[in-house]
Amino acid sequence: MTALKENNVIIGIDPGIRNTGWGIISNFENKLQHIDHGVIVPETEDSDASRLFFISSHLDEILNNYKPSLAVIEKIFVSASGESALKLGMARGVALNVIASKKNIRIVELAARFVKKAITGSGAADKNQIKFMIEKLLGKRVSKLDASDALAIAIAGSNSKNKKLNPYNVITKSQKKNVNNNLINAINRALNKS
């Protein structure tokens, strides 16, 4: 692996109380490079508080190890289940708290549909389609869907890494329309490899 400049390291986070996916990439001179990925999986029999502590401590360790300058996290999608949305919100809040406690990490929040569209060209893509594209883009096998989602979040967020963003920035409609041509070209190159 080539030496990475610290300011090119990006973490994507797909929060969840059962599984929190994370993916680390760099985007140097518009070249995506896979660094690492994984899924934080608390014990199923643990209380919500214990699960949240487990997520917090493991995410803190990951951030300390890779020292990203940009953290990209998925926004909450409100589903029919209020309890699911609440638990997702708790996991997301813990992740944001850990990230916010670090110096020099900017935070970008992206909607799931935006990430799907940026990676696959369709805002309605399923997890397997995202996984397929991530493996093509990064040239790396990713066995867990939560990890491939997190890598997708990181890649979509890397599109805005050189723009001046405020912490907790929400991508606007005009930014959604202006998807980085380099990312589209990388997707097309990856599709041509298969």
What residues fall within each predicted segment?
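Phosphate- and other anionic-substrate recognition elements at nucleic-acid/protein interfaces
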Residues: 1-194
